[in-house]
Amino acid sequence: MAHKKGASSTRNGRDSNAQRLGVKRFGGQTVNAGEILVRQRGTHFHPGANVGRGGDDTLFALAAGSVEFGAKGGRKVVNIVAVEA
């Protein structure tokens, strides 16, 4: 049985917390203004109609309505189809 831990065993044993990224509201779901739609690193999804983009590239709803995913110019976009008031 070894009485020393070994060269690298004391330098291991670390892990970072998950960042909880991804789509939070899917196509067809109804949302209110300010709700987070997508958490992402970089612009995998781009903001479309009634959607804003935060400093960390998070997409959020600017108006109440239903979520719609689509493409425009080869980019994936997220739109909010506003509810008729």
From Swiss-Prot:
Keyword terms: Ribonucleoprotein, Ribosomal protein
Q: What would be one Pfam family of this protein?
A: Ribosomal_L27
Q: Per the database entry, which stretches of residues form a coiled coil?
A: none
Q: Where is the composition biased (Polar residues)?
A: 7-19
Record InterPro entries: Ribosomal_bL27, Ribosomal_bL27_CS
Task: List the residue ranges of the region (Disordered).
Answer: 1-22
One Gene Ontology term of the molecular function aspect: structural constituent of ribosome
According to its UniProt entry, the protein's GO biological process terms are: translation
Among its keywords, does the record have S-adenosyl-L-methionine?
A: no
Q: Which domain of life is it from?
A: Bacteria
Whether Ribonucleoprotein counts among this entry's keywords is yes
Matching entries from PROSITE patterns are given as: RIBOSOMAL_L27 (PS00831)
- Cellular component terms (Gene Ontology): cytosolic large ribosomal subunit
Family of the protein in this entry = Belongs to the bacterial ribosomal protein bL27 family.
Q: What is this protein called?
A: Large ribosomal subunit protein bL27
